Amino acid sequence: MVEVSEKPNTQDDGVSKQENRNPASSSSSTSDKEKVAKKGNSDATKSSTPEDLDAQLAHLPEHEREILKQQLFIPDVKATYGTLFRYATRNDMIFLAIVSLASIAAGAALPLFTVLFGSLAGTFRDIALHRITYDEFNSILTRNSLYFVYLGIAQFILLYVSTVGFIYVGEHITQKIRAKYLHAILRQNIGFFDKLGAGEVTTRITADTNLIQDGISEKVGLTLTALSTFFSAFIIGYVRYWKLALICSSTIVAMILVMGGISRFVVKSGRMTLVSYGEGGTVAEEVISSIRNATAFGTQEKLARQYEVHLKEARKWGRRLQMMLGIMFGSMMAIMYSNYGLGFWMGSRFLVGGETDLSAIVNILLAIVIGSFSIGNVAPNTQAFASAISAGAKIFSTIDRVSAIDPGSDEGDTIENVEGTIEFRGIKHIYPSRPEVVVMEDINLVVPKGKTTALVGPSGSGKSTVVGLLERFYNPVSGSVLLDGRDIKTLNLRWLRQQISLVSQEPTLFGTTIFENIRLGLIGSPMENESEEQIKERIVSAAKEANAHDFIMGLPDGYATDVGQRGFLLSGGQKQRIAIARAIVSDPKILLLDEATSALDTKSEGVVQAALDAASRGRTTIVIAHRLSTIKSADNIVVIVGGRIAEQGTHDELVDKKGTYLQLVEAQKINEERGEESEDEAVLEKEKEISRQISVPAKSVNSGKYPDEDVEANLGRIDTKKSLSSVILSQKRSQENETEYSLGTLIRFIAGFNKPERLIMLCGFFFAVLSGAGQPVQSVFFAKGITTLSLPPSLYGKLREDANFWSLMFLMLGLVQLVTQSAQGVIFAICSESLIYRARSKSFRAMLRQDIAFFDLPENSTGALTSFLSTETKHLSGVSGATLGTILMVSTTLIVALTVALAFGWKLALVCISTVPVLLLCGFYRFWILAQFQTRAKKAYESSASYACEATSSIRTVASLTREQGVMEIYEGQLNDQAKKSLRSVAKSSLLYAASQSFSFFCLALGFWYGGGLLGKGEYNAFQFFLCISCVIFGSQSAGIVFSFSPDMGKAKSAAADFKRLFDRVPTIDIESPDGEKLETVEGTIEFRDVHFRYPTRPEQPVLRGLNLTVKPGQYIALVGPSGCGKSTTIALVERFYDTLSGGVYIDGKDISRLNVNSYRSHLALVSQEPTLYQGTIRDNVLLGVDRDELPDEQVFAACKAANIYDFIMSLPDGFGTVVGSKGSMLSGGQKQRIAIARALIRDPKVLLLDEATSALDSESEKVVQAALDAAAKGRTTIAVAHRLSTIQKADIIYVFDQGRIVESGTHHELLQNKGRYYELVHMQSLEKTQ
């Protein structure tokens, strides 16, 4: 029999756990994945191209191939820049047109200044040759200086409108893209998610949408302004003298060739970088979401290395991209300076030939200077546009995908009066992601209306597939599912799902209140629109029916209690009961219970099962169960084996047949020794217990002040709780978050990331300084050139000679700039990508270093931390690499330019320099505002990204509740709030940006007016004047450019502070600390001495109250009791996930809080309820149990044999090399659990901790695995937490917990004879043939 995975939909983790996923050919699938990832195909499906899909599905008949193809195929969208604006509204486009015109008009201001400059040059020559009087000269000078002031005012207004406008439109359009993307994600069929990592969705919705926003916001305005400057400058040049302008225009062709050639590589590299980061994001999401597992096994180092594999790939492509941009910028500068040389050389010839005058040449040359210089401002933005296009292609490929099974579609019929008869007719099913495995073959089954049908069978037999097909998560490849005789494919999908309520094994709650979580069950029902009062009554009634009301009322905020992300503040049993209340609140026609009580303890299960039995009366119910005691009373029990129906009938009929069902029953039977006590008495006792729990007031059940036995249950689950040794945590948290760092501290901190590159970085700084000195040198050449062209006709011979010399100097300067700019680009590419690589790697390691308390904080949800890794590290590059090089370069320009100006004309230079502090102040003030804005804005995007991540990772729950619309409304609300906040902030900061950019005109007005006066009086000659003015123009422009980087610098400062905070956080339980005694050998005595413990999230409610417990070496003890009584907390404290409030936990008489935590944990092994596997092979996952990368095969085989998984692994084509998929999605729950057990056994631990280790297994697997665990426990101290009491009968001592204390202990037989709590629990779980 082919063993296939059991549970496709039990865990809403975004990478759906496919019950079909026998890893039989996972290696082929993975090689396909790798192939396509390397090609850089679209985001989610690793095999979305038609060729790849056809190859994978080639072995299937054509009609089956088509059905699977529809569920997997993703269109390959060829995005262009225009595609990014596809969601712009008419108003957006009108606004865009206005702000574009403003940007273009702002760009024309500088070329207009060249006209004034040329005119003044002619005037200066006239006064020098005494052609005009001093008064006439003064009048012309004053008038032209005022024109400069008017130009400055116009520039200020236009730049302000442009900057605010583009940021607003960019944010508005990106907001729509974010919403459309999430909307598209929520419409996809589940097969799409089987190929998608949850981390990828987070990366797309945060990092990639941010890239789009960056590419369509203020950078568009800056680019349009630069291009406008370029073109208007050349137009002015052509108008003044077309021949010279035409010759200078030849450089445009050279620039286009350089930009065009290099940008192809830039786009490709950008795309490949994003692909690698997406894959890394998936790994990070896997690890962070299962942090307790990683902590218990000490696998942080191995998992960090796995993450780094993807980071290295991203670094490689990122370096290529940055290097190409550096070379492109160097080439542009070389072309620009060569153009000056060409212009002077040809201009001198035309002047000597009498074809033009000095005024026109100066005008044209200056226009070419400014026009060519402005094109340099376009180059840095090309990366942002290229990244935006790459990100857009990925996002739009998902948005454009037409889902094969679309819950958002209005197509399909509805049935007026649903009766609830379900029929599976000739069903054959293959999961799209595992086309090699047939999960169901020839299934014919009728589920009569109003009756309860139970599905049982071994793990992976196809039971949960029935739920998947009825909910239409998948389409079968042949056959049909009928509801009241209608094929469900013809029915409207949303309507269909609204007729069905699903409770799955691992329920998903949403990060809102208990009341709102239950209310979600009313979506689409007639009761949805009732009054608030009626809805409240329904919700309370449903909670009572699900045995949840009492524990809810015991919580401080009752129904208004926030359950935390995915319900993490509640225990498994509590979450399950809320999920049941949610399912029954709408009084559905069809109820699907996919192991609905498996997470409950026996006490809760008895009552909830009674509630479910009552709830299922009169409605069609399909129950999937491993625990057979829950389905004895079903109208029909269907036994499914290997994807086919083996037998069906009632409990009694099947027991009489003595077939597969009886084997399952025998495997689960508890051998009670009850003497002569009759069965009737036993049943009577059970009924009494149930009625007692339902009717006795909550306080008396709990003997005193703590209402309901589950008051602390919300605090009792190891995999969900906040932790730290005392309530001081809340104060410590506020201190952490309030820590402020100075700019110097942050710069030193970021520089630390580039320590290994410090030598080549110094070279980079050297080249940046040389590049920066280029412009002041060019100012000297320019002033010399103009002076040369001012010579009278009598000296035209000298004029030609000097012009040739200075033209050659320009050519030399161009070559030097080519070398220095390119070298700087290459060096900073290496440095900045290394910085991003180390920042991601170290911050991931810093996260993994943290104790469990850190991950329990609401702001540290999986989505938020994954988003932090993808977004914030990118922002750090705002003070590294290319940006830092450019800042150093333009700072050098400013300093050298002003120094040269002072050296040649100190009076004029001092007047001009007096304006520079104002320029700097404008820029730095804007930088400060943006840093503040960034801190606020980031929080909002983090919460919306975290929300989107939560919704997509719970996609099956969202789909079955038809909650898509509600998710979208909340998400859009969060985006709208963010947009309003950011607009106010941008409106302020843009004032300063516009001021800093337009202030140069006021400087020029002052410089011309004052310098002209000096020249008119004969104090300065033309060379001094032109040199000072030229230096000031470029100097002040450089200052403006520094501050155009301040958005990046603002983001970087905010990001650096977050990183510093993370790195500075030293956890109380620190895995990196060498402190504490190291244990060489362990005997295995565990003691709890008067342990008190409570979680800081609910500091007012104790979890453990004076726990005293001793486990002797080699002893097997079991902890049982109601949900939330502190059993799993005990395991958590043994693992030292948390420290106790008072009292202590001791091993061999030593307080574990004084031991070295790594050394101590190396002697423990944990097998928890939800097994966690990571991407990689089966062998990799088993080896995570030890800290070595390689072990002899014999040891690996022995561990797997002991866990009863060896034979299954060897039956796979690739054996131990089989890839398990994201979160082990290629395997069934049972298979994953056995690999997790092998991982625990390979450690050869002295202490074995089993937290409901067999609860995910069916009876058949459980029996064998339990035998393996029993064998493994020999010679080891073993602590087992169990709901299923059959698994712990053989324990040396069984401790019964209640309210954080031990109320009873002894062996199985002793406790049965006592007829106390344990006896009640056993009684309720006993499975006997009904008489």
Swiss-Prot record:
PROSITE patterns attached to this UniProt entry: ABC_TM1F (PS50929), ABC_TRANSPORTER_1 (PS00211), ABC_TRANSPORTER_2 (PS50893)
Its placement in the membrane is given as:
Multi-pass membrane protein
Q: Which residues form the ABC transmembrane type-1 domain?
A: 97-387, 764-1051
Which residues have a glycan attached per UniProt? 293, 529, 737, 860, 1108
Q: Which residues form the ABC transporter domain?
A: 422-667, 1086-1324
Keywords per UniProt: ATP-binding, Cell membrane, Glycoprotein, Membrane, Nucleotide-binding, Repeat, Transmembrane, Transmembrane helix, Transport
Instruction: Give the span(s) annotated as Disordered.
Output: 1-51
Mind listing the GO molecular function terms for this protein? Answer: ABC-type oligopeptide transporter activity; ATP binding; ATP hydrolysis activity
State the name under which the record lists this protein: ABC multidrug transporter MDR2
Q: Which organism is it from?
A: Trichophyton equinum (strain ATCC MYA-4606 / CBS 127.97)
